[in-house]
Design a protein with these regions (language model features):
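C-terminal segment of classical bacterial N-terminal signal peptides
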Residues: 15-23, 411
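Ser/Thr/Pro-rich, low-complexity mucin-like regions
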Residues: 151-201, 212, 265-268
Length: 457
């Protein structure tokens, strides 16, 4: 069973990325996207982990013609991917990533982050470069679980390193580049190639929790100090469990622990929380307890504001990253004093409202995630639906009898085209000369118009 790991992290920053997007063969086009628009990952793994390095890429290889078709015959075609900035050498020199390499077997017993060939691998066995897997049901090629990580090396330009480190380390590039190429398997001929953004960023947990540790007497708190304070506070809830005393590997040093071990997180690819021996499993999901604590706990006293910069970006990657970066950010709704650009809460709902309605008890579900049809008409959303996590938009097909993924033309959630991040737009500009969603017919249809329009869904 495929694991799906992600976080709904919601980029107003043009990077200095140099991306090559071109078509190698006039008869084929390959269009690649990330599955979420942003993946969160922890900056250290010695004490606890919310999310490990885990990224997913999708691509559709389209054979052009009067009636173009996506092709997924693995015996005839090969589609490869390469995370350009992440190399074995750069990750070996990255102390945060090496913390993952050391602690991953403790967090996920039976898993080795180093494959038999000596290369780094993700939880599903996917590496930083390799072949994508054809999916005939989804009419796409996919690689799940790539261990992509924000880059601090010289593989990224200074302009790309827009993400600051709450622990004081060097800036990092949260918008990596994936090079995707399609080949004729028999002849090795290059049929098409493109590039797309692979996002991976740190959340805002440390920036706040180090200050919490200071308020409990730690003058210059470390992540371990912060973990100890969180454990003490966790013991004050109804579970009475001090998570900072759990020692899963019995080496005499508490941690590392995984939050979803006791609080179910479907994004980890699990249907039940595995639990720790001697400790009860919670009835509440990880999404529920995390958001409910920060929204309602009398100690935290968080005052929520619908403006993402004052609310969501305190936890989800904000500051220089601003991971909600698509065309909706420049669309205005409301009138008068209530007029504003579209915020997270306009699609997802106010956090307190979501908690009250029990949405966090069904995280990542198409029953609780936003739907395009709430505001837009004739979306085709739900057509050719292949199910799975992360909602109807990501897993639906439209256009030409439900052959094309919505994201192939429109981009991934939170980075819909045109995006405010220049790198997100490079692929569409190369394909049709515009950053807009794919709308020039002869991109795929031979003999059709080269003018921009709105294709039927």
């Amino acid at each position: 069973m495929k694991k799906k790991i992600a976080v709904g992290c919601l980029a107003l920053a043009a990077t200095g990325a140099t991306l090559l997007t071109s078509t190698a063969h006039a008869d084929y086009k390959v269009i690649a996207t990330n599955d979420l628009g942003m993946h969160c990952v922890c900056m250290g793994f010695d004490t606890f982990v919310l999310l490990p390095p885990f990224n997913t890429l999708r691509a559709q290889l389209i054979q052009r013609g009067e009636d173009p078709v996506p092709v997924t015959d693995g015996s005839r075609f090969k589609v490869t991917y390469d995370i350009v900035q992440n190399t074995e050498a750069s990750l070996k020199a990255d102390p945060y990533y090496q913390s993952w390499v050391t602690n991953a077997p403790k967090l996920f017993p039976g898993f080795n982050p180093v494959a038999a060939n000596g290369k780094y691998q993700g939880l599903t066995g996917s590496q930083l470069r390799g072949e994508m897997t054809p999916d005939s049901q989804g009419a796409m090629w996919e690689v799940v679980g790539v261990p992509a990580y924000p880059d601090m090396s010289s593989n990224s330009t200074t302009a790309q390193k827009i993400m600051t480190d709450p622990l004081g380390g060097p800036n990092r590039n949260p918008y990596l580049t994936a090079s995707v190429k399609a080949y004729d398997r028999a002849t090795g001929a290059l049929l098409a190639q493109t590039t797309t953004v692979v996002p991976a960023a740190f959340g805002g947990c440390c920036g706040c929790h180090l200050n919490v540790a200071k308020s409990y007497g730690y003058a210059n708190p470390t992540p371990r100090d912060s973990f100890n304070v969180m454990g003490m506070l966790h013991a004050q809830n109804s579970s009475h469990i001090n998570i900072a005393t759990i020692d899963p590997d019995h080496d005499g040093v508490p941690g590392p622990i995984r939050c979803s071990q006791c609080h179910l997180d479907p994004a980890m690819g699990e249907s039940v929380a595995p639990g720790y021996a001697g400790y009860p499993v919670s009835q509440y999901t990880f999404s529920d307890v995390l958001h409910r604590w920060h929204a309602q706990n009398s100690v935290v006293l968080t005052n929520y504001d619908p403006n993402i910069a004052k609310d969501c970006y305190q936890c989800h990657p904000g500051n220089n990253v601003n991971c909600y970066r698509d065309g909706h950010t420049t669309s205005t709704i409301g009138s008068g004093s209530s007029a504003h650009n579209i915020w997270c809460t306009d699609c997802h709902g106010d956090l307190n409202q979501r908690i009250a309605q029990g949405q966090m008890l069904q995280p990542w579900s198409d029953t609780t995630l936003p739907k395009c049809a709430t505001c837009h008409s004739n979306t085709g959303e739900g057509g050719g639906y292949i199910g799975g996590l992360f909602g109807k938009y990501l897993n639906s097909h439209g256009h030409r009898n439900d052959k094309i993924l919505c994201s192939t033309c429109h981009g991934e959630p939170h980075a819909l085209n045109p995006s405010t991040l220049a790198a997100d737009n490079t692929q569409n500009i190369a394909l049709q000369g515009l950053a807009n969603p794919i709308g020039v017919c002869d991109t795929c249809h031979t003999g059709k118009s080269s003018n921009y329009g709105t294709p039927p869904h």
